[in-house]
């Protein structure tokens, strides 16, 4: 999507790109090396775009959520709901609306304020997997 919109933002001399990464891009975990690498790349790509467009009034933000209760774990574990449920044991996982609230917070800052990144975790989460 950024590829499609960035040229228009440059032409208009304004815009805001908000990319969704993951704490897995900060804290890798077993069995997810490729996923962690791609999420790390989201942050680096965002930083690069911010640098490349610094004179164009384009903000670039990376949101890096931790454990969010979605279908992600069921997909990861090929439909094994019991195994997927273990991911959330003992953690009051983030919900999609928590990420949406952070996105709105970032998007609604004054023109002179750029939030480069936010890492969002559940209260009982310390890394991408605990």
Short names for language-model regions:
Residues 2, 38:
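Active-site helix of classical SDR
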Residues 59-69:
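Conserved SDR Rossmann-fold cofactor-binding beta-strand/turn motif
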Residues 62-63, 82-126:
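C-terminal helical subdomain
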Residues 73-82:
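Short, flexible, mixed-charge acidic loops at enzyme active sites
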């Amino acid at each position: 999507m950024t590829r499609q919109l960035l040229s228009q933002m440059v032409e208009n001399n304004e815009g805001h790109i908000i990319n969704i990464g993951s704490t897995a891009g900060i804290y890798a975990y077993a069995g997810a090396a490729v996923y962690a690498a791609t999420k790390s790349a989201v942050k680096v790509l965002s930083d690069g775009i911010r640098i490349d467009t610094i004179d164009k009034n384009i903000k670039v933000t990376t949101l890096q959520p931790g454990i969010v209760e979605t279908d992600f774990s069921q997909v990861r574990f090929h439909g094994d709901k019991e195994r997927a449920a273990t991911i959330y044991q003992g953690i009051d996982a983030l919900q999609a609306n928590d990420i949406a609230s952070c996105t709105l917070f970032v998007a609604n800052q004054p023109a002179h304020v750029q939030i480069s990144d936010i890492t969002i975790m559940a209260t009982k989460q310390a890394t991408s997997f605990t």
